[in-house]
From Swiss-Prot:
Protein name: Beta-2-microglobulin
Similarity-based family: Belongs to the beta-2-microglobulin family.
Alphabetical list of SMART domains matching this protein: IGc1
Locations listed in the record: Secreted
Organism of provenance: Acipenser baerii (Siberian sturgeon)
Matches recorded under SUPFAM superfamilies: Immunoglobulin
InterPro entries attached to this UniProt entry: Ig-like_dom, Ig-like_dom_sf, Ig-like_fold, Ig/MHC_CS, Ig_C1-set, MHC/Immunoglobulin
């Protein structure tokens, strides 16, 4: 599975670079949310979805109290017409009082790594 994902990501990146003249640089639109209503103490899935970005090189990290959460799964890099890309990263979690969850995004269009915070639906 890892080799397949790596191959697909490399292929998409190569295709994007071949067609650089067809795309313009674009910042990622970032959405961080939970699969179910965010309730403290209830198992859930934390999701970070980034879309509309170019070039394709991007790094996503799901964080709990500013520390990367182990075991997160990442989708294959995909693109829309105009060579704008989208990617999703998710992980199982059980939110507790006092914990802070965020998605850290690194992309060439951002001056620095940027954190986007998840807020429970209370």
């Amino acid at each position: 599975m890892f080799l397949r994902s790596t191959f697909v990501a490399a292929l998409v990146a190569c295709l994007a670079y071949i067609h650089l003249g067809d795309a313009t640089e674009a910042m990622p639109k970032v959405q961080i949310y939970s699969r179910n209503v965010g309730e403290l103490g209830k198992p859930n899935t934390l999701i970070c979805h980034v879309s509309g970005f170019h070039p394709p090189n991007i790094k996503l990290q799901l964080l709990k109290n500013d520390v990367e959460i182990e075991g997160a799964q990442q989708s294959d890099l995909a693109f829309h017409q105009g060579w704008h890309f989208h990617l999703t990263k998710s992980v199982a979690f059980t939110p507790k009082e006092g914990e802070h969850y965020s998605c850290k995004v690194e992309h060439s269009t951002l001056r620095e790594a940027t954190r986007f915070t998840w807020t429970p639906d209370m």
